[in-house]
Amino acid sequence: VNGIISNIVIVKADGAVAQNEICYVHTGDTRMMAEVIKVIGDAAYVQVFDSTRGLKIGDRVEFEGHMLEATLAPGLLSRNYDGLQNDLEKMDGLFIARGSVTDPIDFGAEWEFTPLAAAGDRVTAASWLGEVKEQWVMHKIMVPFTMTDTYTVKSVVPAGKYRVTDTVAVVTDAEGCDHDITMVQRWPVKQAVRCYREKPRPSRVMETGVRAIDTFNPMAEGGTGFIPGPFGAGKTVLQHAISKQADADIIIMVACGERA
């Protein structure tokens, strides 16, 4: 650490550092996550996601070599997360302690896996290998989005209960190298998923359950809507009403700042 300006820390790096790279700032026994927001020469400006109280010049910083990532796997539904995908239900107290980290899902839980692919099938990124039912949602277990080539399925486990970290399939690339695939993958939050065959245009109305919206300002499935207004206008209340009544299978509520 070379400089500290509130939660912005200037770090002198002894190697290559990339924009948006994740790093950890150490102060005492506390390890705080941060993100690189600017790089000038060997100086990296990082934004710390925790209080920098007690941090001092000379403290150690470790760079991870990857961007901020989200864990994608069965077990995400009905969870309450902070902005770094820490499970808030696993934390004690009314406030989040500095440096607190919890697993986003229960890695020890078992899920009923049903194979959809067979040995010899040709697959690419996002191809379905199997499925897992979580509550009312049928999750498709896919070839990881980061695998960009065409692969041949070498083996798929039979139907049964498995943990998300267990290998459920093995695929072989063109060079004969095998790749183990589990039910969990990590994806950079700032990188768009592009391994789709088709991106249909919005063509159906999504019923919000609010007659004024459905009549005068209808929203499309796959479309975007927004609610402008001053303080106290009822933006969040309307958002809650849409979340409770809309014709949708999964609702993701994101609260920021005073709404959190």
At which residue positions do the language-model features occur?
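N-terminal accessory targeting/assembly segments
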Residues: 2-97
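Short alpha-helix capping/helix-loop boundary micro-motifs
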Residues: 8-12, 44-50, 107-118, 152-156, ...
